[in-house]
Swiss-Prot record:
NCBIfam families: trimeth_pyl (TIGR02369)
Keywords, comma-separated and alphabetical: Methanogenesis, Methyltransferase, Pyrrolysine, Transferase
Pfam family, one: MTTB
Organism: Methanococcoides burtonii (strain DSM 6242 / NBRC 107633 / OCM 468 / ACE-M)
Enzyme Commission code(s) on record: 2.1.1.250
Enzymatic class: transferase
Top-level taxonomic group: Archaea
Stated role: Catalyzes the transfer of a methyl group from trimethylamine to the corrinoid cofactor of MttC.
Annotated catalysed reactions: Co(I)-[trimethylamine-specific corrinoid protein] + trimethylamine + H(+) = methyl-Co(III)-[trimethylamine-specific corrinoid protein] + dimethylamine
Name listed for the protein in its UniProt record: Trimethylamine methyltransferase MttB
InterPro entries: MttB-like_sf (IPR038601), MttB_Methanosar (IPR012740), MTTB_MeTrfase (IPR010426)
Gene for this chain: mttB
Pathway annotation from the record: One-carbon metabolism; methanogenesis from trimethylamine
Family under the similarity heading: Belongs to the trimethylamine methyltransferase family.
Record flagged with keyword Transferase: yes
Length: 497
């Protein structure tokens, strides 16, 4: 099977899009990746996973744990992986399908370890995130109409060392949003607990739990070119239960991958595809995303910026690679290195949002993020909800047809008159973009309303949502059974200490 059988990396949706790779470029990245699979190969820490690779015909060195994957094994895995995934929410209106090259969706950032708390205009503080913060971020995302699913926004750090933190991080989001939930960086040995929570939600019906999972698992290979034991076990156990998985590389060009972005894409591609291959070897047809949180390492500052043009370019490139392989994509976007909601955040988030969106990535994650991905801000989430809304308007472009050309209305209104009272204008009052919290008043009206900066307006909105928004509840009997799994996990954790 040759790569000519694969998708050519072109968008299949209407509207504005960008194609910055030629087909020859995509084939070159793909070909270099196949070379990497042979030399130097992929180090696989998990013995069970190495056995699967060996059984499939891969060259496995048990001493070095390096696996060399033949091209035909990679091609077969790509072909068995589905190009379409349905993300089930607790409510029907929050269930949607993603397809390679299809519609763009959005989720919040995950996973931060701090919260940026608004105290007064221009005054913020950062604190360690807690389970309460996790619940509140889920509730606000449940309200936000431009956030289609919920990613684990912050860690429940108040459970660290006290109980099964990751199991709490499974249960709490499900209680506080009816949207699909991406569980980020969970624990491989605890997948059975996650599965038991899912079964309990469906009243013990395993068939329903397998066919309609309301959460997915996100895992990361270790750059460069390693898949650790935890990631391997997450793959093997999750696909066994029918839980979709998201393989997402977090490489840094110039540090854990080549400094040139084309080379970055080669190692990124090898890392993600190796995880996808493992998933398909374990369970052909397993639902997988091709993911990215890869960026460029800033060699002058010693940081990995996420508000950079490089992150936007890499995420857009990954969208094209996903289309090339006919796989749904999940990429970093709407990102910033700013510490508080400010002008830097607005610029960086708009840039890193539009690039992968116009390239056709299926899920863009990053809303609410601050400080290079360390911190989450509810106020920034509100601002990003508007940034995403405006980005969606850009993606629609300018349709040209008999209706939109408006020749009849131009001739009826004539010279020197206005179109405000025209029926066509009244019928399309919602056609123009209308942000929820961005201010479009003149200075005098803005001053009369209190001269509030955008973070203050966003804070007021967050306060209102947390006070008034009601998440669709889960039946109390089901909650009891789900909570019993969490309690059991906590007890097991404490007994193992």
């Amino acid at each position: 099977m040759t790569n000519e059988n694969l998708c050519a990396g072109r968008n299949r949706y209407d509207g504005v899009s960008i194609d910055f790779f030629s087909d020859a470029d995509l084939r070159a990245i793909d070909s270099a990746t196949m070379d990497v699979f042979q030399n130097p190969g992929i180090q696989v820490s998990d013995a069970e996973s190495r056995a699967l690779f060996k059984e499939a015909g891969c060259d496995v060195n048990e001493k070095t744990m390096v696996v060399k994957i033949p091209e035909h094994v990679v091609r077969r895995a790509i072909m068995t992986a589905p190009s379409k995934i349905t993300l089930y929410g607790r409510e029907k209106q929050h269930t949607f399908t993603q397809q390679a090259g299809g519609k763009v969706h959005y989720t919040c950032f995950g996973t931060g370890v701090k919260m940026c708390k608004y105290e007064a205009p221009g005054v913020f503080k950062t604190v360690d995130s807690t389970e309460e913060d996790l619940a509140n971020t889920a509730r606000v995302c449940d309200w936000a109409d431009n956030i289609d699913s919920y990613s684990l926004a912050v860690s429940a750090r108040d459970w660290a060392g006290k109980g099964a933190q990751d199991v709490h991080e499974t249960f709490t989001p499900l209680m506080n949003t009816s949207k699909h939930f991406f569980h980020i960086d969970p624990v491989g040995e605890n997948v059975e607990y996650y599965w038991d929570i899912l079964k309990a939600y469906y009243g013990g019906d395993e068939e329903q739990a397998r066919s309609r999972p309301i959460f997915s698992e996100l895992l990361c290979p270790t750059s460069p070119l390693k898949i650790g034991t935890n990631a391997c076990q997450l793959i093997l156990k999750s696909v066994n239960f029918g839980i979709p998985i998201n393989v997402i590389s977090m490489a840094m060009s110039g540090a854990s991958c080549p400094v040139h972005l084309a080379g970055t894409l080669v190692t990124h591609n090898a890392e993600v595809l190796s995880g996808i291959v493992l998933a398909q070897l374990a369970s052909p047809g397993a639902k997988v995303w091709y993911g990215s949180s890869t960026t460029a390492f800033d060699l002058k500052h010693g940081t990995a910026p996420v508000g950079s043009p490089e992150l936007g370019l890499i995420s857009a490139a990954v969208a094209k690679l996903g289309q090339y392989y006919d796989l749904p994509t999940y990429v970093a976007s709407t990102o910033t290195d700013a510490k508080v909601p400010d002008g830097q955040a607005g610029h960086e988030k708009t840039l890193t949002n539009l690039l992968p969106a116009l390239a056709g990535a299926n899920t863009l994650y990053g809303a609410g993020m601050l400080e290079l991905g360390m911190t989450f801000s509810m106020e920034q989430l509100m601002i990003d909800n508007d940034i995403i809304s405006m980005g969606k308007k850009v993606m629609k472009g300018i349709p040209v047809n008999d209706e939109t050309l408006g020749l009849a209305s131009i001739q009826k209104v004539g010279i020197g008159n206005n179109f405000l009272a025209h029926k066509e204008t009244r019928d399309n009052i919602n056609l123009v973009s209308s942000p929820d919290i961005f201010d479009r008043d003149m200075f005098g009206d803005w001053a009369a309303a209190g001269s509030k900066d955008i973070a203050t307006v966003a804070h007021e909105k967050v306060t209102e949502i947390l006070k008034n928004h009601e998440v669709t509840p889960i039946d109390s009997d089901l909650v009891r059974d789900m909570k019993a799994v969490v309690d059991r996990a906590d007890a097991d954790f404490r007994s193992s200490m």
